[in-house]
Amino acid sequence: MRDEAIRILRHMGFALADGPEIEDEFHCFDALNTPEDHPARNEKDTFYFDSGKLLRTHTSTVQIRSMEKQTPPVRVISPGSAYRRDEIDATHLSAFNQLEGLYVDTDVSVGDLKGTLEYFLRALFGSDTEVRFRPHFFPFTEPSFEIDVKLKVDGQEPRWVEIAGCGMVDPNVFEAVDRELGLEPGVQARYTGLTGFAFGIGLDRLAMIRWGIRDIRALIENDMRFLAQFQ
């Protein structure tokens, strides 16, 4: 699933980017416009080390690091592991796999965002796949959307299934990156004033939907009877 998603997005012009799994609060939260009182920053939700470092809760951290290293335009995807203090059950793991993407340039629009993700999801699930965008909230994007696709699940009639989150990058994110680079937004800015979109997809959830896997724990239990189906 991971390789197929990467192949499609690379064909669309996205470059692979990577970053550390042990992160700091700036790259995981502050730069992503996440306020100090946000529940995601609580020790009940995030794995913190005594040093103050943490296990990244999403691969959006790589988007910030990519902007720090590159000059616009930026078009990257960052597949990798993320970690949260979730109670492990049929749909949740404390360590899971994500794929996130970022595109930043001049005059990037919501239409670009929707067109990109519709193309990607139809390449993944079939050209006739129905896709819809629902308004949502994320701290680091505005406007924000959740994406549903209409699929047959467990042999039942087609129904809407939540598949990803996305949105237009909040201007506060660009300003945070510029300040970290020592650039004054609006004066020497590298990113302030540009536009862009970001998206995030759970690869484990994609695999569960694609192959009708009912329990996410099957992906990590190394049961050969299960794994043999995918050779």
Which stretches of residues belong to each language-model region?
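TRNA-recognition modules of translation machinery and tRNA-sensing kinases, especially anticodon-binding
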Residues: 1-231
